[in-house]
Amino acid sequence: NVPVKGMICLESIGYFSDEKGSQTYSTPFHKLTMGTAGNYILVVSRKEDGEFGKAMTNKMKDAGLISTKSVKGLKRLKGVDLSDHRNYWKYGYPAVMITNTAYYRNKNYHRKSDTIETIDFRRLSAVIHQLNMVVREL
């Protein structure tokens, strides 16, 4: 057995848009609280992720290299468990998903038009640098 502090899932972290209306959500509430421009990264955690989830969320927001928002991954939120963190949650391990919200933002997601030209490398790099800062502090 190896002790696991937590799992960090990177899901679709390279597509950004400052255009209003570029970000959609599964609930109207999130549109009101998070806005309609897809220009941020999202940290998804659950209360069961405990201190790891709290630390990841707070440190990502505090790092300040890229706008960061958070949401608790309630099962009723469509798509909240559609990535590699799902099985960690299933077996009781703390896990967070760092995402740009995939198909809620990127209309190219899993299509032929999902090409390297659609990646915002400046902001993708900011996400990676921010994660590097956060992981070093955990």
Model-derived features with residue positions:
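A glycine-rich helix N-cap at a beta->alpha junction
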Residues: N1-F16
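Active-site-adjacent substrate-binding region
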Residues: E19-G21, Y25-L138
